[in-house]
Amino acid sequence: MIKKSAAILAGGKSSRMNYINKAFLKYEENYFIERIIKALEDYEEIIIISNNPEEYTEFGLKVFKDIYPSQGPLSGIHSALNYIKNDYCLVVACDMPFINKEVVNYLGNIKEDYEILIPKFQERLQPLCAIYKKSCKDIMEKELINNSNKLIKTCFKFSMKVVEEFPFIEKIHKKEIKNFYNINTVHEYEDLIRKKEI
């Protein structure tokens, strides 16, 4: 058991997905959110951040609303850090159907000498599959109050440890290397399903 919390961010408007709740898109017979919950099962606590908590009752998890709604993923992370019981929280977006258990467990077991532990994959930082220290919430709140809600910009206000190497990555099946791949548009989702059926 990893003595950290995990939070699934499911509060976005999904405007590029015709306002469909991306958490309930299906891949291989399971909702995205079901696949993510399964990958996070070794974390001591799992919560969901959503402004529609009634949609998630079937999963038996605590669901909390954004403290500062309609301010993007920074608001979701800030809310999660206010509600978790542990000092560190892995944050995952609900539109990442390939979240891999081995990857998130590897992150969760890295020594806690950071405020933010953030993977870098294919030359890009991945703030929506990263671990945040609970104490980050205070500076995040100041940013939200000032309407400065840019996530990456805010991350640079903290001591970050960047993870660029995953020693086991070559052992992971090709489709699971997409751990950080997210679905933003109807076209991307249709393309995902089409490739699965080929």
UniProtKB/Swiss-Prot annotation:
Upper classification of the source organism reads: Bacteria, Bacillati, Bacillota, Clostridia, Eubacteriales
The record, for SUPFAM superfamilies, names: Nucleotide-diphospho-sugar transferases
> A single Pfam family, by name?
NTP_transf_3
Q: What is its EC number?
A: 2.7.7.77
Enumerate the catalysed reactions: Mo-molybdopterin + GTP + H(+) = Mo-molybdopterin guanine dinucleotide + diphosphate
- What gene does the UniProt entry assign to this protein? mobA
Q: Which UniProt keywords apply?
A: Cytoplasm, GTP-binding, Magnesium, Metal-binding, Molybdenum cofactor biosynthesis, Nucleotide-binding, Transferase
Q: Which cofactors is this protein said to need?
A: Mg(2+)
Q: What is this protein called?
A: Probable molybdenum cofactor guanylyltransferase
Q: What class of enzyme is it?
A: transferase
| Cellular compartments annotated | Cytoplasm
Query: What role does it play?
Result: Transfers a GMP moiety from GTP to Mo-molybdopterin (Mo-MPT) cofactor (Moco or molybdenum cofactor) to form Mo-molybdopterin guanine dinucleotide (Mo-MGD) cofactor.
Gene Ontology terms: cellular component: cytoplasm
Q: Which family does it belong to?
A: Belongs to the MobA family.
Q: What is its main location?
A: cytoplasm
Keyword Cytoplasm in annotation = yes
Q: Which GO terms describe its biological process?
A: Mo-molybdopterin cofactor biosynthetic process
Q: Kindly list the positions annotated as binding GTP.
A: 9-11, 22, 66, 95
Organism per entry: Clostridium perfringens (strain SM101 / Type A)
InterPro entries, per database record: MobA-like_NTP_Trfase (IPR025877), Molybde_CF_guanTrfase (IPR013482), Nucleotide-diphossugar_trans (IPR029044)
Stretches of the chain forming a coiled coil according to its record: none
Q: Name one GO molecular function term.
A: molybdenum cofactor guanylyltransferase activity
UniProt binding sites for Mg(2+): 95
* Domain writeup: The N-terminal domain determines nucleotide recognition and specific binding, while the C-terminal domain determines the specific binding to the target protein.
